[in-house]
Amino acid sequence: MIHWDQSRTLLSFPRVGLHLSWYGILFSLGIFLSSFSGIKLATALCKDREEKKELRTSLENFALGALLAIIIGARLAYVLFYGGSFYFENPSEIIKIWKGGLSSHGAVISVVIWAAVFSRLHIRKLPMLSVTYICDLCGAVFGCAALLIRVGNFMNQEILGTPTSMPWGVIFPNGGGQIPRHPVQLYEGLGYLVLSCILYRLCYRGVIRLGSGYSAAGALIGVAVIRFCAEFFKTHQGAWLGEENILTIGQWLSIPMIFLGVGIIWIASKKK
């Protein structure tokens, strides 16, 4: 068994009142690595030198906007689906994201919305920047961000797993007591990374064409399935559904993603 009681703070500068948390650093690093990978993939597949320069600049701008969209969307979704009545009674707490509380489903929705807005603003200059192209690119490179965010959850001792007798069980004293639990944060994060690496490789080799919709669809379905399965190893989350419910709020939110992914594949296949 592993006893995990790491401080949430990675670096602290008390004289200036600055405290850098593991979660914040890992979140930022994950977004940076995924953005870097996306720009690298897109420019590698672009053959025109001038177009490649414009594409790089445009995607860098997209990444900056996506970071803000993810934070806002993930926070609002958490407030709506997991916060119960707490945030309605204490609205000032909504902006306090440093206390924790982000929803991956909200992050997905916000990125898609931002992709649609960004595409509308830039598609005349770069016709390749369709909503489908941007979403395909995001689907192929989201893994680094997803993994490191879940590692941040692990460091924070949050999103705890169910009790286990397996040798890799982890004891989280801050919230989990002295009971060994599944490190479900790492299960889920590694699943996302593997899925993303597969999609990245398929796009890079030309098996999946960016803009076809298949990468985005594969990511939606894969993420939903991984999340759905991971929920069975998590302790109860959310205030709207009680523990007596067959499915968790995370599983209910994952089901539409599967249908959406299948729908995108069906539409894409009709265009061939």
Curated annotation (Swiss-Prot):
Entries under InterPro entries matching the protein: Lgt
GO MF terms held by the record: phosphatidylglycerol-prolipoprotein diacylglyceryl transferase activity
An example Gene Ontology biological process: lipoprotein biosynthetic process
Annotated localization: Cell inner membrane
GO terms for cellular component: plasma membrane
Sequence positions that bind a 1,2-diacyl-sn-glycero-3-phospho-(1'-sn-glycerol): 150
Stretches that traverse the bilayer: 16-36, 62-82, 97-117, 129-149, 206-226, 246-266
Family listed: Belongs to the Lgt family.
Protein's UniProt name: Phosphatidylglycerol--prolipoprotein diacylglyceryl transferase
Organism placement in taxonomy: Bacteria, Pseudomonadati, Chlamydiota, Chlamydiia, Chlamydiales
